[in-house]
């Protein structure tokens, strides 16, 4: 008796489903890709309970004939390739003939389909891969596939499902990527009767980006284009000031297929060069058109891994396209042009820490307990509405009516403020070892900060500043040199650490609420983790499509910091994922103290410098910034006398030291 047997087809399909169908989002991906291959122009995805209860994909594509319908549930049955040579010139998204049989083997599936050549359509119902019903019905041209009770016969897979919100976020991300890959298709995503995503299907990639990431993001995107004999690269990349905390917003498309490729991601970052802050990543949508002979998509059942010939040449093409596009943007003239148009409330201009700046006075406000730049000229003022979009080139400005023709303004411009994400306010040179994603280093930092003891600070007499960076003071122990950024960072850290801890009861109503816009997946993830934000006094309410509204803010957060501060908190929450309230508050205090502190190349007047030293003296630990860098160094009188050789060692001591 032989020990080797051929597995039943249903069991083989269930095994294949383990590779193809990892979660409900995998089902959505496979069904939508089939609809795209069927040349659909409209695709509607409806889900219930994040796809575990029901997934329905409706398209207006070519449909299937009555004879082909049962064959679609047979493993390795496909209409997309017919010979071995076809495998090397694949232009469809699917070709393996595994998706539909795999999905059908672990669910109940209902398919209604019709082609335009016939007067009637077909209905197929199957459970666990076994066909129960196959009959003729009346149905529109196209295909409607309903998947119910997913994983009903594979409970082990259900056990590893995450929360409903997490699974829904994965589905939203899949639909968004496919929408970007195929802007010519109108996509609609509906979850439990609520519309989450809708694109117009006009074929305009910028319009698709606006529908997914929002109009504000689209205004900060630059077009790129490059080509050689083998590749055509096009798409949009964000300005260096518009970044995110992870790579999830970097979308690479090859012949209309979303792929993951580490080397191409690196090429994108190389194109930005030093313009990106460490640990930050741009928003990118790059479409690569390539000869199918140069790309092998038959690597993994999910077809997200692609081997590309001449990959180094493609990397250089992408990097060059991005760097050339950024080089063409003369950001300073554009910013000044927008500043001249200011007609609203003004904020202090954010400085650039790595460039030699013109000296400007920084003053101290004892009532607000904070520093400010004196607004003496129009060029030092930025309008609130242009703070985030001030550097956009005229060629990439997009009108709302142009991008979103079906959208309507719900509220007047004076009833709310549209919050803008903060620009990068500290650089790698400030804290080269700071990485909020490195949980081990961060934990060590937090433990050190928690165990700090009260220190005694010497009495200092301030007398000068050097290079707009270092303060000089004298005391009974000699000369002290203070790093002004590290000093105020320590002051701010202890302020935020204490104030954030009191956030539960100290809230102030906003006269004009703020609106905060996120991508679909981030919007869903934030809803799931909203309790963490509530713990620190941030109460966001759902307000329209992928938008939250903030009606009150914690007292510890200054009014001018609301927009950037809330975005920073949300980014950290998305980045750190699950985190205790205590750790979250400490991380938040560290981050906000760094971003809110004065930087190098910024001159202080005497009064402001003395007040900074006074605040530093009141800190629990005035000697180190939260990241461990020294705040000040000391040269004693004896040290100074040795440097000027007023004190010299005798010959005996020098011989003892081995110098003679």
From Swiss-Prot:
Single GO term (MF): ATP hydrolysis activity
Gene Ontology terms: biological process: mismatch repair
SMART domains: DNA_mis_repair, MutL_C
GO cellular-component term (any): mismatch repair complex
Transmembrane segments: none
Pfam name, any one: HATPase_c_3
Top-level taxonomic group: Bacteria
CDD domains for the chain: HATPase_MutL-MLH-PMS-like, MutL_Trans
Region (Disordered): 414-433
InterPro entries per UniProt: DNA_mismatch_repair_CS (IPR014762), DNA_mismatch_repair_MutL (IPR020667), DNA_mismatch_S5_2-like (IPR013507), HATPase_C_sf (IPR036890), MutL/Mlh/PMS (IPR002099), MutL/Mlh/Pms-like (IPR038973), MutL_C (IPR014790), MutL_C_dimsub (IPR042120)
Keywords associated with the record: DNA damage, DNA repair
Biological function: This protein is involved in the repair of mismatches in DNA. It is required for dam-dependent methyl-directed DNA mismatch repair. May act as a 'molecular matchmaker', a protein that promotes the formation of a stable complex between two or more DNA-binding proteins in an ATP-dependent manner without itself being part of a final effector complex.
Similarity remark: Belongs to the DNA mismatch repair MutL/HexB family.
Protein name: DNA mismatch repair protein MutL
Species per Swiss-Prot/TrEMBL record: Streptococcus pyogenes serotype M5 (strain Manfredo)
Gene it is expressed from: mutL
């Amino acid at each position: 008796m032989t020990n080797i047997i051929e597995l039943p087809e249903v069991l083989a399909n269930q095994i294949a489903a383990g590779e193809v169908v990892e979660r409900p989002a995998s089902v959505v991906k496979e069904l939508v890709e089939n609809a795209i291959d069927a040349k659909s122009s409209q695709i509607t995805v409806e889900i219930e309970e994040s796809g575990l209860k029901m997934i329905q994909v409706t398209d207006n594509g070519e449909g299937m004939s009555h004879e082909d319908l049962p064959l679609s549930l047979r493993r390795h049955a496909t209409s997309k390739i017919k010979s071995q040579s076809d495998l090397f010139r694949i232009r469809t998204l699917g070709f393996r003939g595994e998706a539909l049989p795999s999905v059908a083997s672990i669910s109940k599936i209902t398919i209604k389909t019709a082609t335009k050549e016939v007067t009637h359509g077909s209905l197929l119902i199957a459970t666990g891969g076994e066909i129960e019903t196959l009959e003729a019905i009346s149905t529109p041209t196209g295909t409607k596939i309903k998947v119910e009770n997913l994983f009903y016969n594979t409970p082990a897979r259900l056990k590893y499902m995450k929360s409903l919100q997490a699974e829904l976020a994965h589905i939203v991300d899949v639909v968004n990527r496919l929408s970007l890959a195929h802007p010519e298709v109108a996509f609609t995503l509906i979850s439990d009767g609520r519309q989450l995503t809708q694109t117009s299907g006009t074929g305009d990639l910028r319009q698709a980006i606006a529908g997914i990431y929002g109009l504000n993001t689209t205004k900060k995107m630059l077009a790129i284009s490059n080509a050689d004999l083998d590749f055509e690269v096009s798409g949009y990349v964000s300005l260096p000031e518009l970044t995110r905390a992870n790579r999830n917003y970097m979308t690479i498309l090859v012949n209309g297929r979303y792929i993951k490729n580490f080397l191409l991601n690196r090429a994108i970052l190389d194109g930005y060069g030093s313009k990106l802050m460490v640990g930050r990543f741009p928003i990118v949508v790059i479409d690569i058109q390539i000869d199918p002979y140069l790309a092998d998509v038959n690597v993994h059942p999910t077809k997200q891994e692609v081997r590309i010939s001449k990959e180094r040449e493609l990397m250089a093409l992408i990097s060059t396209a991005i760097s050339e596009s950024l080089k063409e943007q003369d950001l300073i003239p554009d910013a000044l042009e927008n500043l001249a148009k200011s007609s609203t409330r003004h904020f202090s201009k954010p400085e650039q820490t790595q460039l030699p700046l013109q000296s400007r006075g920084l003053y101290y406000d004892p009532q607000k307990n904070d520093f400010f730049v004196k607004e003496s000229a129009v060029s030092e003022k930025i309008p609130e509405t242009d703070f985030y979009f001030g550097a956009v080139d005229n060629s990439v400005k997009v009108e709302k009516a142009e991008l979103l023709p079906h959208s309507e303004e719900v509220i007047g411009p004076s009833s709310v403020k549209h919050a803008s994400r903060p620009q990068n306010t500290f650089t790698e040179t400030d804290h080269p070892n700071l990485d909020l994603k490195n949980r081990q280093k961060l934990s060590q930092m937090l433990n050190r900060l928690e165990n700090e003891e009260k220190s005694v600070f010497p009495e200092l007499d301030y007398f000068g500043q050097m290079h707009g960076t270092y303060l000089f003071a004298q005391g009974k122990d000699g000369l002290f040199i203070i790093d002004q950024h590290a000093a105020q960072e320590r002051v701010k850290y202890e302020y935020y650490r204490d104030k954030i801890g009191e956030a539960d009861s100290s809230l102030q109503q906003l006269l004009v609420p703020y609106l905060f816009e996120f991508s679909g997946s981030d919007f869903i993830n934030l809803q799931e983790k909203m309790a963490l934000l509530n713990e620190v006094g941030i109460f966001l309410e759902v307000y329209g499509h992928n938008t939250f509204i903030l009606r009150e803010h914690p007292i510890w957060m200054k009014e001018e910091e609301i927009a950037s501060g809330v975005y920073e908190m949300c980014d950290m929450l998305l980045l750190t994922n699950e985190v205790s309230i205590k750790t979250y508050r400490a991380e938040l205090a560290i981050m906000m103290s760094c971003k809110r502190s004065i930087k190098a190349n910024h001159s202080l007047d005497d009064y402001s410098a003395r007040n900074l030293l006074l605040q530093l003296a009141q800190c629990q630990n005035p000697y180190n910034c939260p990241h461990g860098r020294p705040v000040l160094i000391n040269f004693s009188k004896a040290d100074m006398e040795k440097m000027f050789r007023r004190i010299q060692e005798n010959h005996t001591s020098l011989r003892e030291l081995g110098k003679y």
